[in-house]
Amino acid sequence: MAALAIFAAATGAGAQQVPRLKFEKYTLPNGLEVILHEDHSTPIISVNTWFKVGSGDEKPGRTGFAHLFEHIMFMGSQHVPVGDFDKLLEAAGATNNGSTTEDRTNYYENLPSNALALALWLDADRMGYLLPTMDLAKLDLQRDVVKNERRQSYDNVPYGLVDETILKALYPKSHPYSWPVIGSMADLSAAALDDVKDFFRIYYAPNNATLSIAGDFDPKEAKMLVAKYFSAIPRGPKLPPRPSLAPIKIAKDTFLVLEDKVQLPRVFYTWPTVKAYNADEAPLDVLAAVLASDKNSRLYKRLVYDLQTAQSVSASQQSGRLAGIFQIDLLAKPGNKPVDLDKIVREEVQRLIAGGITPRELERVKNSYRSLFLNQLASIGGFGGKANLLNQYNYGVGTPDYVQEDAARYQRVTRADVQRVAKKYLSTPKIVLTVVPEGKTDLKLTSIGGDR
């Protein structure tokens, strides 16, 4: 889970508890899973579709396809001309978006209650009838859009190649997480129309998707509309088996340097840890929050407030379906070197391994997580509302209403748990990447204890 940004004031037994989400789930004959959740508090509905495909389902030499289709899915289908998808939704007062990760692709529409039929028709048409309009001109257009996105967000932005550099060092070349979600320029350029169409046929079929509807609707009407628009879409081919992968291990500390067009050096520490919903994930999230989540966290107080050697610090446990990492990220303040930051990071990590965390730190983080879950449940849709949560847990653990149990596992974390995972994972070999201004490779960290 991402590092926390908001800390709640609620404490003790009187704190609001995370409720269980009521839902109904069923499956159409073509394999499409449907999840319904009624909430009549406001006249709003969110339609949220998850396809169980991400960059982790791609192959070396064919990267970037999942993210490419995130764009293509907004470019019209057999009964929806190019440009009309957004126009029709905007005219109805709706908002929509999509996103791609290593593990899944999702799309949502947030709209007034009376526009449910419109959203379902649009989503069904692009799921079932996109390929008849898919030609080389459309592929080339979106290929150029994505390549430009890569230039602006990765290749030509300060620190933009950090993730790609770390992934290549951390994972074997054949591992599905060894390349970035956006793919490589070479693979995007080489993508053939037939290859892209085949990818869509396999992964964007109803038997590889879940449709979640949350908000102010009548369930009988919703079921009728879902059947009307989605039932005729044929089931896709048998999905290729996903590989069973051993946990990632690093034999020894690996020190990397990346010269970039930046003014300030930045250091990233990355340890291989656990995949999503592993028993150690919640303690690792708590550990990250104690180290570097806000102004009260240990690294922030030492590096940003007391010593004033860092401009920013963060820590996070990032868990995916196949693997996970624990990462600390530090940006040096002008006039300070990475070695100055490294000394404090090592001290604080060892202090935590040796002495654990305080009861107050644990309580503070638990309160923040309770607040985080409650804030997500306060929203119907979007990337973090109830419609998306139902899809997230349905995919991750097979239970759409897992949010209550997910919140509970953070409340069960003990100080001993946090100390245990700190020792178990942060005592192991890691990737250390130093990003330095061009021509300043002498600033890089080259050993445990700093530069030589």
Regions found by a protein language model. Give the residues of each.
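Proteolytic maturation boundary segments
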Residues: 2-36, 218-259, 270, 301, ...
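M16 family metallopeptidases and their MPP-like homologs
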Residues: 37, 42-60, 64-68, 82-129, ...
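Active-site His/Glu-centered metal-binding helix of metallohydrolases
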Residues: 65-73, 287
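Short, polar/flexible loop-turn hinges at active-site or ligand-entry regions and domain interfaces
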Residues: 75-78, 128-137, 357-358
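Non-catalytic, conformational "gating/processing" segments within enzyme and secreted inhibitor domains
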Residues: 136, 143, 197-229, 430
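His/Glu-based metal-binding/catalytic segments typifying zinc-dependent metallopeptidases
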Residues: 151, 156, 167-168, 238-296
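PPIase-associated folding chaperone regions across multiple families
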Residues: 279-287, 304, 415-417, 430
